[in-house]
């Protein structure tokens, strides 16, 4: 568990020689759909005061902390659309124990929502006041800055005022009456493990620069080069194999329930999947399809 749950792309984890993803895929999985909402909403009981609060991820800031226990707090800390959303969340989110994080989907009254890049279509018109896609649960002893995160692996019940969207997924087993929990691994896993014996891995600082280079290549639409990997050709090759492995695993995943997803009017399986077990939490996303769409979306922002 980590203080703030940042879900990594598998290929990014390998840059420093981290083997947790390779360990993870050899065991049983807890699988869910990755929901493309915005902004991120954090809510629950503030351990410092015992009062209910709402906020964005800024509630975890070390210095300029923005925890909102009243509407006046929201007016002081936020403005514009984010403030409006937080006012709705303060009014309609249930007062339950614990601390949660999820993505805001929208307000009730429709059966179709485009909170960020992907459009979600529900079976019926949503009658609840707000819609949230929860994904993370936090525990904290006395201060939100000390909160410890873990993936949300239990169900939050809808209320008459708030609809919670958590779309489960499974691994295709080949049997119509059996939901798989383990991946079928291809020979590329052995290729990766063999290549790792000869690769010179990079530091955390160097890995951060490589990730920036990768994001730039996606945003600007050019192919990755050796220079993007700081001249480390074998690491670039390993990175490519990890993408092949990720795509193979993603192809084995299936949506179990939840709203239909559309991108630019075309039906898609969703943004991707989130897999979790004792070795960590990872996202299986086609970055060339969805990250570039997010980069080019004027609504896209980290709040």
Please provide the spans of the model-predicted regions.
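Covalent nucleotidyltransferase
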Residues: 35, 40, 51-204
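Short, surface-exposed beta-edge/turn micro-motifs
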Residues: 28, 38-40, 129, 269-273
């Amino acid at each position: 568990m980590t203080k703030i749950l940042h879900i990594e792309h598998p290929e990014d984890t390998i840059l420093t020689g981290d083997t947790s993803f390779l360990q993870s895929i050899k065991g049983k999985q807890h699988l869910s759909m990755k929901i493309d909402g915005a902004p991120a909403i954090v809510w629950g009981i503030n351990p410092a005061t015992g009062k209910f609060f709402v906020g964005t991820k800024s509630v975890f800031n070390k210095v300029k902390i923005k925890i909102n226990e009243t509407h006046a707090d929201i007016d002081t800390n936020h403005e514009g659309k984010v403030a409006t959303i937080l006012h709705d969340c303060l009014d309609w989110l249930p007062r339950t124990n614990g601390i949660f994080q999820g993505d805001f989907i929208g307000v009730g009254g429709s059966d179709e929502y485009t909170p960020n890049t992907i459009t979600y279509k529900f079976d019926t018109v949503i009658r609840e006041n707000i819609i949230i896609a929860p994904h993370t649960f936090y525990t904290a002893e006395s201060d939100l800055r000390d909160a410890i995160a873990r993936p949300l692996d239990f169900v939050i019940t809808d209320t008459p005022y708030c609809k919670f969207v958590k779309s489960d997924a499974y691994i295709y087993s080949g049997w119509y009456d059996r939901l798989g929990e383990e991946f079928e691994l291809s020979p590329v896993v052995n290729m990766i493990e063999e290549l790792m014996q000869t690769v010179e891995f990079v530091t955390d600082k160097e890995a951060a620069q490589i990730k920036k280079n990768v994001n730039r290549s996606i945003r600007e639409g050019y192919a990755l080069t050796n220079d993007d990997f700081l001249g480390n050709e074998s690491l670039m090759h390993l990175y490519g194999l990890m993408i092949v492995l990720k795509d193979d695993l993603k192809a084995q995943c299936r949506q179990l329930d939840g709203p239909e997803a559309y991108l630019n009017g075309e039906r898609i399986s969703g943004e991707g999947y989130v897999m979790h077990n004792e070795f960590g939490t990872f996202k299986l996303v086609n970055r060339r399809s969805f990250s570039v769409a997010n980069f080019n979306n004027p609504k896209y922002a980290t709040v």
